[in-house]
Design a protein with these regions (language model features):
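Bacterial N-terminal signal peptides that target proteins for export
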Residues: 1-9
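Repetitive helical segments and hydrophobic/amphipathic motifs
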Residues: 12-16
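Subset-of-secretome marker
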Residues: 27-261
Length: 261
């Protein structure tokens, strides 16, 4: 009986030793410390830190940009649009003899502020038709960058400058319907009982900037900006004629307030 008790005690001691050895690694006494390094770019908020993969490759940036625009098409049914155009470096030459000539050409070149609330289902074309149906491609752009900013990713894409943009081709046609081509300017001149023998337009500083959520990659806001420099020769304004008129329209368009279904 005594021998049996001794055997049992010995087994318990041996088992305890095995358990202690097995637990050494868990207590950190024998297992070396491991270091985990993340290669992802981090975007942080004041309360939490989120790991977000910020694309660096141009193709991947454009892909994320297109996905954000598609999000609006699929999930949103309301949004707000603000358009602002200011005219600078206006030179109306001899037409300054007319007291309202400056205001007339600011109007012709599109100066003003416009705010609109859209029901997407009723006004789908305003947003959807402003961009290529198959999405943007890297070859359309001169540059594409992405960076982390608080709880969002800021994607900026830039386009090449162009001369005499039109409604069918070119950089401006890719990003908005809210620009003026020579035909639009010609019509505006007619509305003011005016005309020009030649109209030249140069578009430049063409840029789109999207704020994309780090949570679901939805589009939070979209800003479009560009400049158009107008040079009109042989201008007739009512009874005044023969002057050259030039000016720059600085256009900014903001889409925001997207409401999802």
């Amino acid at each position: 009986m005594k021998n049996n008790i001794i055997r049992i005690v010995s087994l318990i001691i041996a088992l305890a030793a095995v358990v202690q050895l097995a637990s050494c690694g868990k207590n950190g006494e024998t297992e070396p410390e491991k270091t985990v390094t993340s290669e992802r770019t981090k975007a942080s908020t004041s309360s939490t830190e989120k790991i977000v993969e910020i694309p660096e490759d141009k193709d991947e940036i454009v892909k994320m940009f297109n996905a954000a625009l598609d999000f609006v098409d699929v999930y949103c049914y309301k949004y707000k649009k603000h358009v602002k155009c200011s005219v600078s470096d206006l030179n109306i030459g001899s037409l300054s003899a007319a007291s309202n000539a400056g205001d007339a050409f600011r109007n012709i070149f599109g100066e003003g502020n416009f705010d609109t609330d859209y029901d997407y289902n009723k006004s789908k074309d305003d947003f959807d038709s402003s961009f290529p149906k198959s999405g943007f491609t890297p070859d359309m752009l001169t540059d594409a960058t992405a960076s982390a900013e608080s709880d969002r990713i800021i994607i900026t894409v830039r386009f090449p400058s162009e001369s005499n943009p039109d409604k069918e081709n070119g950089s401006l046609r890719l990003i908005t319907n809210d620009f003026k081509d020579s035909e639009t300017v010609k019509k505006s001149l007619t509305d003011f009982n005016s005309s020009a023998s030649s109209i030249s337009i140069n578009a430049y500083d063409i840029e789109m900037k999207a704020a994309v959520s780090t949570v679901d990659r939805s589009l939070l806001s979209l800003d479009i900006s560009f400049k158009e420099r107008y040079t009109l020769s042989g201008v007739k304004l009512v009874e005044l004629e023969g002057s050259t008129v030039s000016g720059i329209s600085n256009v900014s368009i903001n889409y925001s307030g997207f409401v999802t279904q």
